[in-house]
Each structure stands twice: as structure tokens, then as C-alpha cells.
């Protein structure tokens, strides 16, 4: 045994120098102790898939960097020394490929299980660790095991080729105490432990590399010969009265336009370029809740990423983050507008597949796209599509476009044998590079068509963009969602993909709403969104520095002490540090007088800043509504606060994708009021809440966050009551006109204030809540009290403008 271990020691010491030059790995997760909940006070051993000194030394480097025990240092238990690592399989040589569990590993597991039998307090944590040399997926048709043992020469080649693309993956701990208590401590349990570890390692590799990639020609041939596409080609030839061959060529061209051409080498090179780019333009990337997604990938889920869409940067950022978190970059549905040279071919090789804006009147295109998407799901590739259908121009989450969601459920109705899970993703920035363009488009300027010149002009503007945020929201397991919503859904499974059951549309709409709510739940609060919210709430878009810090502190305290959701994130810095950081991004005017600094926004920046405020307005909507009620009423009963919130909440919930159900509101109001009282903004005596006059400004600025939204509701409701004869389309149009007038007279810059889409969705909610009947006519007995309540919540001068405008409409 000694000669063998001294041989190992010699080979390890000889390997150290070349490996220090050739190997630069990434640990996943980067902070395993925190992410995997490893108890550093309990003993730790490591399990590796194959006997390999190279893997062991690579693991040693990353374990020590992460603050974990050195795998090469013995583990001392009750005065006995144990090896701190086990190999689950032997290493093949050039002459043999023994894949059995090494006897010394079984012996170590057995000895440790015996120790657990003797010492009831002992709990050794086994950390499975995989060292992956390169993450290149295989090609279709090359059926090899996902995790392969490499002999000496193969390992040397792997280190030379992929030493810089090495991934050290730590997995959740396996408790030997749990194994001993649940399964006993005999020798067969040691074998079972080794078998479980082997399956686990294979899944690890699949999660990191993804399934084998299709040969494009084979994929095309398979799809072109599928019954659904053959039928669509025949229908196309018949309806257009063209030869079958011509229709086939058309179908092939469509497939060529749509299909991705994924290239691992491009992803690898792109990763380096993007790493350089992010370091140049962002001060940091903040990634949250990635461990949840890693677990899903490892458990074999078909993952569909559904991010919000703020910027063209989103495509690159999410793929980069997933790759760095040890997952496979997804196939991304990209708008056909991005298929221009040279971006189109690059995106395509990075995993983009292209989608036209509309499928209307194109049954052949629709069928081919649906079949291609179903093929991606069937083969197990992760997919990403932007739920809003386009970039948000206002910074608010747009209502979902449901076409891709419907096609996802249709793919499930073919009988997919794997669970499908939606992963909502919130992407946030302290600077969105297109924000100036968005403001122009909202003022009526035509959207500039994407082209190479536009890309170059954008690249020229790249500078300090502050922080970027990628928050993974709470996943939505679709099989579970369908079981709850449509228990009989499996009866509609049809391998041909023709199934369009009646339950599809309402179910997809419900799913879309849940998906958008989960995206907003994962919002990232940052310095820019907080400062923009505070400055825009002040009438002159200006605050003394001390007051700005005080206001940001109020928002932070509210969000920390009454957390919005488990997946939203807050900065850890103080309000003072956040204001300092926001200033460094160069968007504010700072003037100094004898009494200190005044921070303000010029007219143009005021418009742009609404974008950042809108990113987090939903997080502060309810405390803002409570504050506005208190500012207008001065003193009010708790029951009145609860009743007002309950009355207005359905509109806010629909518009801002808020997460709370009606039955949670009363308790939530009490928690918000208690926090406002803790901050000294209000006092609570018995059942009455009264504002604290000394702190009126802080409460007023909090209330003004939601005041423009309430003004919009007041316009719609009072128009409805004063002109009950108007139809829905006329009501939407007139509401928009009154809002535009109000905006001009009162200096409201928010582009969404008179957005037609926002009014359209408001009238849908009015009907759902019973303020309009089935014919769209006003139900006066419910609408009148609400219209009065909304008037009471807004400022008198704004109310007068609305009343004057409504008189002119009525005339």
C-alpha cells in the first residue's frame, strides 16, 4: 500500500507544475458552502467519478479556494485517519477498461458506515464532485455514454485541448448519517451509494453539455418527412395551385430561415469576448437563484426560459450567465428582424432560431415552426423565448404574447416523456443602452430597422453601465400546472400534434399571467431604480441630497422589513452609498449652494428615468397607495385603508402583475402600516392611522409613486360614469385624449401615462370586476362609488383638470 501511495505522491507532484500552467477551471457553484448548504463543522469527503490524479489535483485547487477541506489531507475520526476522497470507477488503461467500483472505495464507504454505527453523533458529508474537461456536446448518431472515463493519453489530450474550459462541479451533499439510519450499514449499502453516485455523475455531464446536437441535414430530412409537414406541403401546393416540388422547396427555405445551427466552438469563443465586454461596460453582474435551475437541469427537466425583454443585450447576457453557471446555453427564439448580416449567422450559431412577427395567413410557415419547436423539446434542448414578444419601451412588464406558450403546451400534447418547466427570468440594468431610442419611439418616431450600422453606432456608445442583474424566478412545472388546471389534459395527447382542445386558450392565458407575475416577483432593486423613483416623485424632479438619501432609505426599509417575494433582490449597501453610486453613472444634474447639494433631472432625463422607475413600481405599489390615502385624508381608520386597498387592488394586480391574492390584503395592509409607523411616518392609535406632520415629505413622495396610475383610473372611471352611453372603443380613445391633455398641463412625462394599451387592459379589468356589463355598458351603482373614491385620492388641481376635460367630452 505504501509503495502505491508513494507512487501516487510522485505522479501528483510531477503533475502540479504543468497543470498550474495548462488548467484554469471554473467552480460551479462559485460559493458551494453557501449554495449547497454545506456544514463546515461536520466532516467532509469527496466522491469523484473516475480514478484520476489530474481530476483530484484540479478538485484540490477549487476546494481550497472555496474554503472547503483539502481532499488530499486525511480525515481524522475518533483517532483514526481516513482518506478524504473516493473514486466511483477505476481508470481505463490502453489495454483494459475496468469500470467497476474500486475495492478501496467500497472498503472506505464500509468503514465510514461502521463508524456511523458506533458513533450516533457522527455525520460525514459526501460531496460528489465532477471535473469536466470541455463541455462540447456530442453529435447525433454518435451514441456514447455522457460521462466517459479517459485513459492516460486521452486525459493528456483533454487537458491540452480543454484545460482552460474545465468545469469543477460540486453537487448537493449526501449525508452518510441519513444513509446509515435509513438503509443500514452493511456492505451492500456501500455498493448502493456508489451506484447512486454514478447515475448522479452522468446527469451532471448531461446538464453541463446538453443532449447530442443534430446534424442540420439529418434534422431537415427528418422534419421534411414528418406527416404534419408533408400534409402542410400538399395543402400549400393545392391552395396556391403550384407544383408539389415548388411547395417542398418553399418549405425547405422556411426551415432554413428558422433553424439554429448551434456551434460549441462559437459559444466558447463568444464566452471570452462577452466576458471582456461585460467587464468593460458593467461594474458587476449579479446572478441570483441559479442553483434552482441547475437542479432542474440535473433532474432531467425540459427547461424553457421565459425572460422579460429590456434590451438586445438580453440575448447575450442570459446565454453568457447560463454558460458560466455550468448549464447549456438555450436555443433562443429571436425576431426575424435580427437576421441581418453579420449578426444573423453569428446569433444562429450561438443557438438562435428565427421567428416571424406574425403567422397569420401562412399555414405552411406555422406548421413548420410548430414542428421545429416540438423537435427541440423532444430532443431535450433547453429553449428560451421572450414572453412579452418584444422589448418593453416603458420599463414595465408588457402583457404576454401567448403564441409560443400555446406551442409549448401543444408540444406537451404529443406525449413528451420528460417534465417541462418554465423558468421565469428577470433581467435588470442600471443603464439600458436603447432607452433614448425607446423614448423617441414612444413620441411617435418610427423604429429604426436593425442593421450592421446600428450595431456599430451602439457599440460606440458602450461605456460605464453600472450593474447588471439576472434573477431566476420561481419555476412553473407545466405538468403540475396542467394537472391542477385541467386534470383531464392527458386525454388530449395526440402524437400528430393536431390537438387543439377547448381548454387551451383559457389555460394558456392563466399560465401567461402566472408566468409574468413570477417574472415581476424576481425583480432586482438597484441604486438607479431607487433614485429614479424618488426624484420622479418630487414635483420639480429635484431633491436635496439629504432628502434623496432619506427617501431611498424609506423605500429600502419598506422592502427589507415587508419583503415583496422570496425571489426579489435588494442591494446590501446603505442609502447613502447607493445615491453615491447612482450619481457616478452620470445621469443627474448636481448643483451646490450654501446649504448643500441639490440633485435633479433635466427634462430629457426625466423621461428616460421613468423607464427605471417602472422596473420596480410594482414592488412599491401597495405601500404607495396607503401613503397616498393618508396624505389626502390625514387621519383614517384601518378598516377604511383596508377597504380602499381591496377596491383598487384588482386594477393594480392586472396592470402590474402583482402577486397577492385578495384574501392576503388585510394582513398585508397591517404589516405595511406597522412599518410606516416604525419609520415614524404615521402613528397608530387604536384603529386609527394618522400621518406624522413632521415627516409629510417622505410620505408624500412615497404616495406620489402611484399617483399617476390613480389619475389614469380616475379619468377612465369618471368618463365611464359621465358618458355611460359610450362604447368600449370610444371610452378607450376619449380616456387617452384626456390623459394626454392632463399630461401636458401637469408636466407628466411618463410615456405609459397615455398609452392606449394600458387603457385597453384597464377596461378589460373593469368588465371582469363588474363595473361594465356583458354588453360593455356602465353599471352605475358599482362604478359611481369607485369614481368618487378615485377623485378623493388624487390632488385637487388634477381633479379639476379631469372634470373640465370631461365636461368638454360630454359637450
UniProtKB/Swiss-Prot annotation:
The reaction(s) annotated as catalysed by this protein in its Swiss-Prot or TrEMBL entry are: sn-glycerol 3-phosphate + an acyl-CoA = a 1-acyl-sn-glycero-3-phosphate + CoA
E.C. designation(s): 2.3.1.15
Alphabetized Pfam families for the sequence: Acyltransferase, GPAT_C
Spell out the InterPro entries in the cross-references. GPAT/DHAPAT, GPAT/DHAPAT_C, GPAT/DHAPAT_LPLAT, GPAT_PlsB, Plipid/glycerol_acylTrfase
In the record, what terms sit under GO molecular function? Answer: glycerol-3-phosphate O-acyltransferase activity
Membrane topology annotation? Peripheral membrane protein
Q: Which UniProt keywords apply?
A: Acyltransferase, Cell inner membrane, Cell membrane, Lipid biosynthesis, Lipid metabolism, Membrane, Phospholipid biosynthesis, Phospholipid metabolism, Transferase
GO terms classed as biological process: CDP-diacylglycerol biosynthetic process; fatty acid metabolic process; phospholipid biosynthetic process
Acyltransferase listed as a keyword: yes
UniProt entry tagged with the keyword Transmembrane: no
One Gene Ontology cellular component: plasma membrane
Q: What is its main location?
A: membrane
Where it sits in the cell: the answer is: Cell inner membrane
Instruction: Identify the residue span(s) of motif HXXXXD motif.
Output: 309-314
Please give the pathway this protein is involved in: Phospholipid metabolism; CDP-diacylglycerol biosynthesis; CDP-diacylglycerol from sn-glycerol 3-phosphate: step 1/3
| Domain description | The HXXXXD motif is essential for acyltransferase activity and may constitute the binding site for the phosphate moiety of the glycerol-3-phosphate.
Q: Which family does it belong to?
A: Belongs to the GPAT/DAPAT family.
Annotated protein name in UniProt: Glycerol-3-phosphate acyltransferase
The coding gene here is: plsB
Amino acid at each position: 500500500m505504501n509503495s502505491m501511495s508513494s507512487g501516487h505522491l510522485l505522479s501528483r507532484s510531477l503533475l502540479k507544475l504543468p497543470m498550474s500552467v495548462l488548467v484554469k477551471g471554473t467552480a460551479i457553484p462559485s460559493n458551494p458552502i453557501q449554495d449547497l448548504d454545506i456544514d463546515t463543522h461536520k466532516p467532509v469527503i469527496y466522491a469523484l467519478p473516475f480514478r484520476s490524479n489530474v481530476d483530484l489535483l484540479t478538485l484540490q485547487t477549487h476546494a481550497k479556494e472555496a474554503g472547503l477541506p483539502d481532499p488530499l489531507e486525511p480525515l481524522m475520526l475518533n483517532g483514526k485517519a481516513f482518506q478524504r476522497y473516493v473514486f466511483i470507477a477505476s481508470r481505463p488503461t490502453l489495454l483494459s477498461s475496468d469500470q467497476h467500483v474500486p475495492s478501496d472505495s467500497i472498503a472506505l464507504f464500509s468503514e465510514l458506515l461502521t463508524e456511523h454505527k458506533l458513533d450516533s453523533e457522527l455525520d460525514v458529508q459526501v460531496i460528489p464532485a465532477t471535473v469536466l474537461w470541455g463541455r462540447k456536446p456530442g453529435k447525433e448518431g454518435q451514441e456514447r455514454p455522457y460521462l466517459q472515463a479517459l485513459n492516460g493519453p486521452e486525459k493528456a489530450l483533454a487537458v491540452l485541448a480543454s484545460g482552460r474550459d474545465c468545469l469543477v462541479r460540486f453537487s448537493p451533499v449526501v449525508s452518510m448519517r441519513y444513509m446509515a439510519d435509513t438503509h443500514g450499514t452493511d456492505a451492500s449499502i456501500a455498493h448502493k451509494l456508489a451506484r447512486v453516485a454514478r447515475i448522479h455523475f452522468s446527469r451532471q455531464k448531461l446538464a453541463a453539455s446538453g443532449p447530442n446536437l443534430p446534424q442540420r441535414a439529418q434534422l431537415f430530412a427528418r422534419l421534411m418527412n414528418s406527416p404534419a409537414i408533408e400534409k402542410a406541403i400538399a395543402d400549400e401546393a393545392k391552395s396556391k395551385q403550384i407544383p408539389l416540388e415548388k411547395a417542398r422547396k418553399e418549405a425547405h427555405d422556411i426551415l432554413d430561415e428558422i433553424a439554429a445551427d448551434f456551434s460549441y466552438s462559437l459559444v466558447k469563443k463568444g464566452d471570452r469576448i462577452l466576458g471582456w465586454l461585460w467587464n468593460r461596460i458593467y461594474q458587476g453582474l449579479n446572478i441570483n437563484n441559479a442553483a434552482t435551475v441547475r437542479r432542474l437541469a440535473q433532474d432531467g427537466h425540459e427547461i424553457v426560459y421565459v425572460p422579460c425583454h429590456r434590451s438586445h443585450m438580453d440575448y447575450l447576457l442570459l446565454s453568457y450567465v447560463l454558460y458560466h453557471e455550468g448549464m447549456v446555453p438555450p436555443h433562443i427564439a429571436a425576431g426575424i428582424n435580427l437576421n441581418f448580416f453579420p449578426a444573423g449567422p453569428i446569433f444562429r450559431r450561438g443557438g438562435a432560431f428565427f421567428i416571424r412577427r406574425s403567422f397569420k395567413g401562412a399555414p405552411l410557415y406555422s406548421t413548420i415552426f410548430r414542428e421545429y419547436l416540438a423537435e427541440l423539446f423532444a430532443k431535450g434542448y433547453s429553449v428560451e423565448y421572450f414572453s412579452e414578444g418584444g422589448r418593453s419601451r416603458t420599463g414595465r412588464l408588457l402583457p404576454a404574447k401567448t403564441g409560443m406558450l400555446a406551442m409549448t403546451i401543444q408540444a406537451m400534447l404529443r406525449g413528451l416523456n420528460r417534465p417541462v418547466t418554465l423558468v421565469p427570468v428577470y433581467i435588470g440594468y442600471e443603464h439600458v443602452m436603447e432607452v433614448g431610442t425607446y423614448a423617441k419611439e414612444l413620441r411617435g418616431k418610427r423604429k429604426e430597422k436593425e442593421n450592421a450600422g446600428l450595431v456599430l453606432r451602439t457599440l460606440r456608445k458602450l461605456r460605464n453601465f453600472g450593474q447588471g442583474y439576472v434573477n431566476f424566478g420561481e419555476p412553473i412545472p407545466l405538468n403540475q400546472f396542467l394537472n391542477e388546471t385541467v386534470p383531464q389534459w392527458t386525454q388530449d395527447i395526440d402524437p400528430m400534434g393536431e390537438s387543439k382542445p377547448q381548454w387551451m386558450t383559457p389555460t394558456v392565458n392563466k399560465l401567461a399571467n402566472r408566468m409574468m407575475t413570477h417574472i415581476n416577483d424576481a425583480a432586482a432593486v438597484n441604486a438607479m431604480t431607487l433614485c429614479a423613483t424618488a426624484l420622479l416623485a418630487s414635483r420639480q424632479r429635484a431633491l436635496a441630497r439629504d432628502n434623496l438619501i432619506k427617501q431611498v432609505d424609506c423605500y429600502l426599509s419598506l422592502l427589507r422589513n415587508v419583503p415583496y417575494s422570496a425571489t426579489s433582490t435588494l442591494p446590501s449597501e446603505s442609502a447613502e452609498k447607493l445615491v453615491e453610486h447612482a450619481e457616478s453613472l452620470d445621469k443627474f444634474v448636481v448643483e451646490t449652494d450654501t446649504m448643500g447639494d441639490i440633485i435633479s433631472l433635466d427634462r430629457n432625463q426625466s423621461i428616460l428615468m421613468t423607464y427605471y422607475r417602472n422596473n420596480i413600481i410594482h414592488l412599491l405599489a401597495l405601500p404607495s397607495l396607503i401613503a397616498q390615502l393618508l396624505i389626502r385624508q390625514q387621519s383614517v381608520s384601518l378598516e377604511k385603508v383596508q377597504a380602499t386597498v381591496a377596491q383598487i387592488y384588482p386594477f393594480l394586480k392586472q396592470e402590474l402583475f402583482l402577486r397577492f391574492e385578495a384574501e392576503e390584503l388585510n394582513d398585508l395592509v397591517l404589516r405595511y402600516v406597522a412599518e410606516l409607523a416604525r419609520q415614524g411616518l404615521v402613528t397608530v392609535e387604536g384603529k386609527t392611522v394618522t400621518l406624522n406632520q413632521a415627516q409629510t415629505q417622505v410620505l408624500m413622495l412615497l404616495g406620489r409613486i402611484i399617483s399617476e396610475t390613480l389619475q389614469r383610473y380616475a379619468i377612465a372611471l369618471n368618463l365611464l360614469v359621465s358618458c355611460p352611453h359610450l362604447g368600449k372603443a370610444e371610452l378607450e380613445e376619449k380616456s387617452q385624449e384626456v390623459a394626454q391633455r392632463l399630461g401636458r398641463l401637469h408636466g407628466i412625462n411618463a410615456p405609459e401615462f397615455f398609452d392606449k394599451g394600458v387603457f385597453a387592459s384597464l377596461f378589460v379589468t373593469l368588465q371582469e370586476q363588474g363595473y361594465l356589463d356583458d354588453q360593455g355598458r356602465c353599471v352605475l351603482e358599482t362604478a359611481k362609488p369607485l369614481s368618487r373614491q378615485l377623485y378623493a385620492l388624487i390632488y385637487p388641481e388634477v381633479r379639476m383638470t379631469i372634470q373640465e376635460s370631461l365636461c368638454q367630452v360630454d359637450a
